[in-house]
């Protein structure tokens, strides 16, 4: 068995994509150690942006490009580092030397466990074991989420330590020893960070793409100007591209240096406050206020790199982003049920199309794996048969003359449901996906052999047979069929067993995984009403528990009021 495949869960490579690098954990203390993000506001000035301006890019756009390429860690892409704050981390460090007992070690252990989870594929022995054997763990795809555990535990421990320092009954010797150990540990950590600063190469896997783009741009410009491609010109272009890579790496190093300096200053200030508090030279209230101000300044200034005035838009500007194009208006004239593919954008990473139409694209971090497989193996390769089975009636393309989106009708779309003439059985999912390359999906359904038992009667061709969508209410979908013989229907809806149930004339029927990602149903001869209902057991159970809990709360409240009334009457 491939070590990257799992049953009932995500692929390992996919699930552990957002693993935090071990050295990257230092972003808890220095936010810019690995550059920050792929689209934040890290740079005010940038060598890379300066070079972009030299070749004609506007200043704002050049700086935007520089910010988009600042991150060079393992997680590609990312919207920013997980930063706890230098002040908070110093207080946590003090707590580790000052506090005693089970609370310290339990919070520390829980926090470190979260960090180990966040390391993901970098600690395979632990995390691959948990992925394979911890119930439901393989359903999640971002190990970096594990950092929420230390984010809670370390802060609690820091607050407990400050409270104990200011209001606890502690000997001067204990406080002095803890402060000294904290200061030594702080200097040691700064030394490690300094070593990393000088040892890092600040390279990213995307740097090669930057160089290639710049080399290509220079060669294209030279060709347009009539220059012949020569070895000398190629060498000049290589040096030109290399200059951009060197510039962005210099920017990354500068960001690390700036944030490291910032962290050292904050650590020093927090150490001074701790020293004053430990020597009783400041009262508790000023100590708490100073630490609060320092910590707030620390966190807010970093936070504004990623959430600032530029992150908000006027309501009118927001609405304009979803304004209908002429292509959208043309499609909206069709009142039928169909889907749309927008090729003018990255259809897997946009939402505007879905705002107006039933889109075959869109984005959600929690992806259905079978549909993701279909995107990567079929839709991404423009398999028209697969687009047809997804009921893609309209395709939005770019008009080469004016660059505007234009809608093209796809007359081959199969519609929301259809009967097939036969079934092609395959051994497994791999063969099922491969069969989509060459099978006439309008006439033949592709089904894995393990689902054959769910099809009581094989379909018999009937030219008069019909099946149609009556109503789609999202969670309830109704169809009607009429056939003189047994049929097999393919529904242009994604196969998802965790909640979807099928009924034929009110009797539950088995849904068959068909064409890798769709639903199939064996339909007996005659006239029938077919219904799909989304009825997840977890929702029904939660709804029932919510009702029971609400009733119990009301009983307790009214019971308490009744007892109080009864007691007052007796008095």
What is the role of each PLM region?
Residues 1-480, 486-493, 500:
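Conserved luminal/periplasmic juxtamembrane motif of membrane-embedded glycan-processing enzymes
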Residues 90, 361, 393, 447-571:
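Active-site-proximal, structured, solvent-exposed surfaces of multi-pass membrane proteins
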